[in-house]
Amino acid sequence: MIKWILIGMAALIGLTAAGVVLLAAIANHKGANYWRFAEPQGAIETRYTGLGEYEVSLAEFDAPGTVWEKYEIWYPSDLEQSDKPYPVVVIANGTGMKASKLRAIYEHLASWGFIVAGNEDEHARTGASSAATLDFILSLNDDPQSVFYGRVDTENIGITGHSQGGVGAVNAVTQQKNGNLYKAICAQSTTSSAVAYALNQLDGELGGGWNCDTTALSIPAFMVAGTGTADAGNVEENRLELAGGETQGICPLWWLRECFDAMPDTVPKVIGRLSGRDHGAIPISADGYMTAWFLYWLQGDEAAGRAFFGADAEIRDNENWQDVTINFP
């Protein structure tokens, strides 16, 4: 049983590597202007795919004695002269995709008025590095010598992550001691329980710690994936016994639905898949609606919220998206 899962995973690793190479190629070619080449549909997705109004600055801090090496914090440059607090988004890294490789995504989110905090952890699935990153930015909020002194809106903190980082984001909220400080989450292409089962059997840095449990989520949650082969696979159910030619995707539709159903119905929750997009492209392709999600929950932007809620929620009829399910109690 494990053999077939791992054979499928070997194929998926090749596909995922191709997705990562594609993402790197896009980043190298388009750099910080990736959003100019996006293809959003609908007024809300289009608006929040573009840059916000803020110029962005970066502060870096060493994290000696840790596997994540340093903390990187992107923030609106106006913060340095402002007397108001800014909401925070922590980003949990996907496998090998540390913050320094995805600067454009951090900068984009910060341009919309967020303090965006990350690190160099390449194995973020437990949520430990995200928890440490949150603790660090909160310590700066209490430090009179820091530019962030009194500038962190501690009542409005969100977290996002892609792939392994999706698992890390969920675990940061549900398993870490400071998880109760988060107000909203966006988990992208979160590694499924079937793939997690196989990965948990491995030795070394990739072995163990891959499970996450959305039953414990009590904050608004937006979970996304793609319809491409690496994310979707070709098995439509949670099944470990696979026949030849069958592969479990990293984040298939059955997993999104399982995560959605596991979350309490008292919690606002949305799932959806990006049509024609695969695993490596999700962080860029979902960026507009991820930004809108956090603007609504952390900044009270009602226009952004109309992407998800109400009779005319834009994401329902957006040609870029399919398999959308919304619960807004």
Placement of each model-derived feature along the sequence:
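N-terminal Sec-pathway targeting helices
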Residues: M1-A18
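Short conserved active-site loop signatures built around small residues
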Residues: A18-P85
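Gly/Ser-rich "nucleophile elbow"/oxyanion-hole loop immediately N-terminal to the catalytic nucleophile
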Residues: E80-Y86, A128-G168, Q175-G179
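Short beta-strand element of the alpha/beta-hydrolase
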Residues: D83-G94, E107
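Glycine-rich His-Gly loop
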Residues: I91-T95, S163, G226
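Short amphipathic alpha-helix adjacent to the substrate-entry channel of hydrolases
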Residues: S100-N119
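The feature captures the conserved acid-bearing segment of alpha/beta-hydrolase catalytic domains
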Residues: Y182-I282
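Alpha/beta-hydrolase-fold serine-hydrolase catalytic core, especially in secreted/extracellular enzymes
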Residues: T266-P268, L274-P329
